[in-house]
Amino acid sequence: MSKRARSLVYSPNMSQKPHCPLPRQPFSVVIIARNAATQLAACLESASFADEIVVVDSGSSDGTAELAAGRGARVIQKEWMGFGRQKQFAVEAARHDWVLSLDADERVSEPLRASILAVLAAPAAQAYAMPRRNRFMGRWLSHGEGYPDWSLRLFDRRHARWSDDPVHEKVLTGEPVARIQGDLLHDSAETLAGYLDKQNLYTSMQAETLFKAGKRAGMAQLLLSPALRFVKFYFLRLGFLDGAAGLVHIAIGCCNSFHKYAKLMALQRKAVASE
């Protein structure tokens, strides 16, 4: 299935407050989590307007499951299957067809909440993307790769599903994708060292996925991919306006491109040597 863009944009008038709630499609918020107790409370609070909250926990040892249950979420234990399959499991476990998929370190802003309620009162599409704002090195990014990081998170599961990708998963749909206003706030609160460790793991997983799919890399991709990425996000998308945090964020993304293809080339050489 392919994902197609649509120019439809919803921006509700926040100054107009109805005297009673509008009838709308019921929806579930689904969250995957593991050892996320320090972040999950804020996520659950921001999602409290949902008709149901489902938290799929993968063996937390820090009280994540207990915290979620204590705040009214339905908690399901499931061994880790990779990001895409874990999120799809959560979607299928929901009671309602309309779902909003969140990570434990994300929060729904008030403008986004208003947009979600508005579109669910009269859905004009089956899938909606929203701008995701990332906090990095203590700064909310406003340009470059960090914003607007359009993310398809609200959808009717009868028309869309998560991919099986173990990392950098995406929602697949054959329907047009509309956009709504209001930021999805992403604040991982992790250290830079922790962030870099995670990126190293992710690029290894990406390289493995590409190799198994029969993809191959050469010197051109190794050199051009990070260079073009830097030009795109630092200059064309004004990443330089985010100061040092913006530069570091984009530079890490460029390094990720280099490392991904370098690891893919290493897998290629290993395969040739073993023949």
Show which residues each predicted segment covers.
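N-terminal amphipathic/basic-hydrophobic helices that include classical n-h-c signal peptides
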Residues: 1-20
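Catalytic-site signature of metal-activated, phosphate-bearing donor transferases
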Residues: 10, 84, 88-91, 97-98, ...
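Cell-envelope/extracellular polymer assembly enzymes that use nucleotide-activated donors
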Residues: 26-28, 52
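Short, well-formed alpha-helical segments that are part of the catalytic scaffolds
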Residues: 31-49
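A conserved acidic beta->alpha catalytic loop
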Residues: 38, 46, 57-67, 103
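Short, structured coil segments at secondary-structure junctions
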Residues: 49, 71-72, 150, 173
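Short acidic donor-binding/metal-coordinating loop in glycosyltransferase active sites
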Residues: 58, 78, 96, 103-106, ...
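Conserved donor nucleotide-binding strand/loop of the catalytic core
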Residues: 65-93
